[in-house]
């Protein structure tokens, strides 16, 4: 009996730390359906500070949502653009842009590839930490030796 309990405990630890296979774009788009996501780090140089995305009007049957997104402009205000995000397997398509989900926990963070760059997105409630450690692992693993640039810095409240 003790052996069975030990095996179950070991398997629970392994599955709790399993960071593979969570690449569904629709799970990423929906997130927790409240708040939004800030771009925390990217391998792209010169990315605008306080880049964000916020989904609303989620349509399960078409796997689409309205996306509001933008960044902090020179005056310190957040820009605001609206588009439709569509999930296609592990791809998020907004207009002519496609991002590929490398990892999502559907609640606190996502790692995506966009335009050849790796990006770490963190839910607006987790900018000070507490997001899934698999996102840090996948971001580091995917970017390899490419330097990471911090994008989330003293950002105003999300619109």
UniProtKB/Swiss-Prot annotation:
GO CC, alphabetical = extracellular region
- Which keywords are on file for this protein? Allergen, Disulfide bond, Secreted, Signal
What does UniProt give as the signal peptide span? 1-16
GO biological process per UniProt: symbiont-mediated perturbation of host defenses
Which cysteine residues pair off into disulfide bonds? Answer: 50-155, 109-134
- Respond yes or no to whether keyword Mitochondrion is given for this record: no
Q: Which InterPro entries match?
A: Calycin (IPR012674), Tick_his-bd (IPR002970)
PTM statement from Swiss-Prot or TrEMBL: Not glycosylated.
Keyword presence, Signal: yes
UniProt-recorded Gene Ontology molecular function terms:
amine binding
Can you say where in the cell this protein is located?
Secreted
Q: Which family does it belong to?
A: Belongs to the calycin superfamily. Histamine-binding salivary protein family.
What this protein is called in its record is Allergen Arg r 1
């Amino acid at each position: 009996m003790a052996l069975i309990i030990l095996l179950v405990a070991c398997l629970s630890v392994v599955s709790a730390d399993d960071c593979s296979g969570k690449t569904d774009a629709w799970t990423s788009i929906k997130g927790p359906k409240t708040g939004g996501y800030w771009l925390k780090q990217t391998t792209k140089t010169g990315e605008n500070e306080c880049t964000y995305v916020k989904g609303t009007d989620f349509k399960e049957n078409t796997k689409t949502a309205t996306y509001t997104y933008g960044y902090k402009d020179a005056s310190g205000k957040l820009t605001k653009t609206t588009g439709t995000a569509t999930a296609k397997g592990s791809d998020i398509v907004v207009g002519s842009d496609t991002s590929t989900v490398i990892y999502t926990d559907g609640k606190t963070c996502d790692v995506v590839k966009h335009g050849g760059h790796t990006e770490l997105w963190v839910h607006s409630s987790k900018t000070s930490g507490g997001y899934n450690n698999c996102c840090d692992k996948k971001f580091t693993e995917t970017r390899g030796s490419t330097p990471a640039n911090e994008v989330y810095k003293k950002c105003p409240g999300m619109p």
